[in-house]
Amino acid sequence: MPAGFTKSLAARLNEISNLDVKEAEDGDCLKKGTVYIAQGGKQCEVIEDAQGNLILSENDKPARGGLKPCADIFFESLVSCSVEHIVCGVLTGMGSDGCKGIRALKKSKDIPVVAQNEDTCVVYGMPRAVVQAGIVNEVVPLEDVADTMIKHIGV
């Protein structure tokens, strides 16, 4: 997603969601019930501090596969975190970004993965990649993604 787009996307999603939605900022401490949208033009990683808090790092690391933010980098950063309760969601998007990172995460933790179904995707690239990789637990229409993830999260 390009720089500048993610702030307005987060604001719009915040208006229509029951959860708090915000554009991620470097140093944000993750809070239950808040959805963070990675900044366009930045890489987003989760770092665990000495007290076990999960902190977002919005940084200028290089693009991977031309992507910045890159979902694979984000998901891979969760592998080393002590948190076990993670739910991954994969929505419409081009390519296979996220597939490698989720595969690595699933190897280290027992996590559910929810993918948007083909019928409700504008572009069925990213969801298709995780479905074909066999790492998805549930495939649901867009309108059911949030409730399905909340069911797994327990919010």
Regions from the PLM with identified roles:
Residues 1-155:
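Conserved acid/base catalytic micro-environments in cytosolic active-site loops
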